[in-house]
Amino acid sequence: MTDLTHRFTGHGALVTGAGRGIGAAVARRLAQEGAQVLVTDQDAPEAERIAAALRQLGLTAEALVCDVADRASVDAAVARAVDAFGSLDVLVNCAAHCSPEAGPKFEDDPDESWAHDLDITLGGVRRCCQAALPHLAASGRGAIVSIGSVNGLMDFGNHAYSAAKAGLGSLTRTLAGRSAARGVRVNLVAPGTVRTSAWEGRDDDLDAVRDCYPLGRIGEPEDIAAAVAFLASRDAAWITGTTLVVDGGLTSVHTGFRTAMDGGRTGPG
């Protein structure tokens, strides 16, 4: 049986969007399992807060500002991880953006919000993978895990965000096929509703959608972090190009989620 406390000993890991929520939970889980983690986020104080909390636990973590929409910033983050840890073995793409929709009609969506959401949520993953791939291949145990959403699998509203998350599924499959010969595995985790800062002050909404989940609860960031850690580890050594849905059974039934929300304009992820 694998010792879960040491699955990533000696591994260098870079996590984007790690200043809060799912990204922070992923950084924490990898560090707890032995990884040396570069916590990156656009919000410098939040990234440093997460890294400092990990260091206080005796874990290895550094923080760096990274804007995944900027190639130079992404390149600098990858270089920092390699310089700090000696190798880059794990890349976890958590950074994303979801613009509020202008209205319930598809034709109301402005070009600007579409371009912004896709450039960060999909384009950002592309930039990070491009920068990291040579180092992941050199490590001999490289793994990429990106955070998708059930929005990319079924109709949960929010056109731009859903399109970007669906694109991640296709990117994951094509990149997995092209990276396998280099020894790099590429997978995707698709969460349902997870209790993050995006839902702060929206307890009524959470209560409304909770009953849509067969397992009877909303997901926690740690639920997603556990799935990411599995896919990034050697326990998943024969898994690549797949989407692991972590949604409390939502997509198995899809029981009226959109009608439970505000006009169906908000997705679960």
Language-model features: locations:
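Short C-terminal tail/terminal secondary-structure segment
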Residues: 2-5, 103, 240-269
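Conserved glycine-rich cofactor-binding loop
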Residues: 12, 19-21
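Catalytic loop of short-chain dehydrogenase/reductase
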Residues: 97-98, 145-167, 172-181, 193
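Short, small/polar-rich loop/turn modules that mediate ligand/substrate recognition or access, typified
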Residues: 141, 180, 185, 239-241
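C-terminal substrate-recognition "lid" of short-chain dehydrogenase/reductases
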Residues: 217-246, 251-252
